[in-house]
Amino acid sequence: MVKLGNNFSEKSTKQPLLEDGFDTIPLITPLDVNQLQFPPPDKVVVKTKTEYEPDRKKGKFRTPKIAEFTISITEGVSERFKVTVLVLFALAFLTCVVFLVVYKVYKYDHTCPEGFVFKNNQCIPAGLENYYSEQDSNARGKFYTVINHYNLAKQTITRSVSPWMTVLSEEKLSEQETEAAEKSA
């Protein structure tokens, strides 16, 4: 508890009295409003624009107006032209995106159809795999190797793809033999 009525400015040398049950710490006295506010000035000086003009003429740096440096490329251009240019830029952007997607699909799609093998970034027939791997990285050599061995690879592929091909070819041979036997008889 705090005992009312004491002041900071009064320093007591007495022993605190414990009989009334209060401590001897004094309360802070309220502040006077006059102590917080400064007195209002007698004169208020307000500079107008005409009073600032002599400062510019004295050689002080003046900030340039922003309007002096603005350049408008659309001034005098019709709205139709602006929309046309905007549409052309949008089409050019979309074309670039489409080409990028097509390139990525072409470059990174490594799935080959059945009967083909992916080798050296190309899908080659399974029958040409041995001949293709023997060639060096010369593209012209690869091309000629594929052309030279095309017939052999075609036969290899057809035999490996269908087991019925041998049966059909044997039937044709037997038919030819019977026809030849009938003609000779």
From Swiss-Prot:
InterPro entries: NSG (IPR009431). One of its GO terms (biological process) is apoptotic process. It comes from the Eukaryota. GO terms for molecular function: clathrin light chain binding. Residues 1-82 are cytoplasmic. Plays a role in the recycling mechanism in neurons of multiple receptors and acts at the level of early endosomes to promote sorting of receptors toward a recycling pathway. This is Neuronal vesicle trafficking-associated protein 1. It comes from Gallus gallus.
